[in-house]
């Protein structure tokens, strides 16, 4: 919808403060660049020739071609036919095409999809450098939470078309509270002993879930459990992963 490819069934779309209607749609899109999954190219043409087609259609200066090829580190491969490009090079060429007009808003859909670890790292570094170098806003859509964790500073999570979370990445991590998971030879007795000491706990999948304790309090509780003749089978510090938080927010359970 942001790119004008799909019309909303209700309401309206505003991009860069302007409505995406018939009067301003093209003016808005001139300030937007996009890379949607795996872009298509003319394989018999070189990378530079492919970009020249886009440059002509967009009406931007020809010098932008050389500049964006340098930005995505393809200036040394500009005379090579795209049919002989690796997948990572093709993705970078797609990013170069999206950057040709130096947009205010850059939309990237699964930009690291199908890349090997080296290609993922290179694409990630390129994407992260763009806001500071060119003052543009970059929106990345990805199902790889680890990639978002390393690239984004603001996050939005959508469930079946509904926005269920929108805030800073730091705020999302804030939902991942550290806690202790305790398993003893008798959790029921241990739970009563902990509550006598005003330590909140709840049972979950065979473990007692406790807040993080000071060293002094942890030592005190260890002595208390020993006095009640309770053996500690396992005590570990846990933290919810981004995947756990995502599944909680979307209400989805993992499935094969």
Descriptions of predicted regions:
Residues 1-140, 145-159, 165:
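ABC transporter nucleotide-binding domains
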Residues 36-40, 176, 229:
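Short amphipathic alpha-helical interaction patches enriched in hydrophobic/aromatic residues
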Residues 34, 60, 74, 132, ...:
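Residue-level marker of structural boundaries
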Residues 56-59, 153, 230, 251-255:
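Non-catalytic alpha-helical coupling and interface elements of nucleotide-dependent molecular machines
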Residues 178-249, 256:
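Short, charged/small-residue-rich alpha-helical element at the C-terminal edge
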Residues 124-212:
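ABC transporter nucleotide-binding domain
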């Amino acid at each position: 919808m942001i790119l004008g490819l799909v019309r909303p069934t209700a309401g309206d779309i505003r991009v860069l403060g302007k409505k995406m209607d018939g009067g301003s749609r093209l003016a808005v899109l001139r300030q937007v660049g996009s890379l949607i999954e795996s872009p298509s190219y003319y394989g018999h043409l070189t990378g530079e020739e492919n970009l020249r087609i886009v440059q002509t259609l967009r009406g931007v200066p020809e010098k932008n071609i050389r500049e964006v090829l340098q930005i995505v580190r393809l200036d040394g491969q500009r005379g090579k036919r795209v049919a002989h490009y690796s997948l990572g090079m093709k993705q970078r060429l797609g990013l170069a095409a999206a950057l040709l007009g130096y947009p205010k808003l850059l939309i990237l859909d699964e930009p690291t999809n199908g890349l090997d670890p080296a290609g993922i790292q290179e694409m990630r570094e390129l994407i992260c450098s763009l806001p500071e170098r060119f003052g543009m806003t970059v929106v990345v859509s990805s199902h790889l939470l680890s990639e978002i964790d390393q690239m984004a500073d603001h996050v939005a999570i959508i469930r079946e078309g509904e926005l269920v979370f929108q805030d800073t990445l730091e705020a999302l991590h804030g939902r991942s509270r550290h806690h202790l998971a305790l398993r003893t030879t008798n959790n029921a007795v241990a739970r009563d002993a902990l509550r006598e000491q005003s330590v909140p706990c709840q049972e979950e999948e065979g473990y007692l879930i406790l807040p993080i304790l000071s060293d002094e309090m942890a030592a005190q509780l260890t002595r208390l459990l020993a006095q009640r003749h309770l053996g500690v089978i396992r005590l570990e510090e846990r933290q919810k992963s981004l995947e756990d938080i995502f599944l909680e927010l979307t209400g989805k359970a993992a499935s094969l």
